Amino acid sequence: MVLVNFFFFRKKTPADIAKKRLQEIVSDHNIRNNFAPYFLPQLKKDLVQTISKYIHNPRILSIQLEKKDNNTSILKCKIIFFNEETQ
């Protein structure tokens, strides 16, 4: 039984958690059918925390949510990483 658990159940990574949150945001947005970026400050904070675990001193320039039409929204995240040697 332990062997089955090893192959079928894995620990959730920060990427898995972020993906699930984004899916919930999108589904909630589709249900309410309104354009309210109430989640952007928390999403930005989560992205910075996750990226900071792997890369030191990330600099986020912008996080934007654009509405293309009634059913489509695009989340744009522009992040620039500076190499310590080139600074």
Swiss-Prot record:
Any Gene Ontology biological process: regulation of division septum assembly
Keywords from the UniProt entry: Cell cycle, Cell division
Pfam families, A to Z: MinE (PF03776)
UniProt KW Glycoprotein keyword: no
Gene3D superfamilies named among the record's database cross-references: Cell division topological specificity factor MinE
The organism's place on the tree of life at top rank: Bacteria
SUPFAM superfamilies in the cross-refs: Cell division protein MinE topological specificity domain (SSF55229)
InterPro entries: MinE (IPR005527), MinE_sf (IPR036707)
HAMAP family (UniProt xref): MinE
Family to which the UniProt record says this protein belongs: Belongs to the MinE family.
Function: Prevents the cell division inhibition by proteins MinC and MinD at internal division sites while permitting inhibition at polar sites. This ensures cell division at the proper site by restricting the formation of a division septum at the midpoint of the long axis of the cell.
Stated name of the protein: Cell division topological specificity factor
Species of origin: Blochmanniella pennsylvanica (strain BPEN)
Gene: minE
